[in-house]
Amino acid sequence: VPEAIEIQLKKGVLALCVLALLSHADSYAYEIASRLTRDIDMGEGTIYPLMRRMQSDGLVETYLVESQSGPPRKYYRLTAEGRRSLEQQKTEWVAFTQAVNAIVGAAA
């Protein structure tokens, strides 16, 4: 059960993490997936469907960049709606983590 909780927590913050990464710089999906796999141990298979969903929701948009080592790369960038969503999710995340920390701290 603890592993299931960890997986659900990671999935719950995945969109926030992607939006935060893209707020710093445009990126392609493999680069985002590699970073999230390394930093929060999230499987790449979860990230690609999320990127497609975020695009269809209007949070990100794509453009192609020629690559010297193969086919063009599809880069993602935040839209104005994506920036608004990031700010809202950051606010919710801070409030949520403060509440959880208060509860967990009180139980210690």
Language-model features: where?
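N-terminal helix-turn-helix DNA-binding core of bacterial DNA-binding proteins
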Residues: 6-48, 65
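Beta-hairpin "wing" of winged helix-turn-helix
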Residues: 57-72, 77
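Accessory beta->alpha helical hairpin/"wing" motif in late/C-terminal subdomains of nucleic-acid enzymes
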Residues: 78-83
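Alpha-helical DNA-recognition elements
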Residues: 49, 53
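Amphipathic alpha-helical dimerization/coiled-coil segments
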Residues: 3, 84-108
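A positively charged, amphipathic N-terminal helix/segment that binds anionic biomolecules
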Residues: 1-2, 76
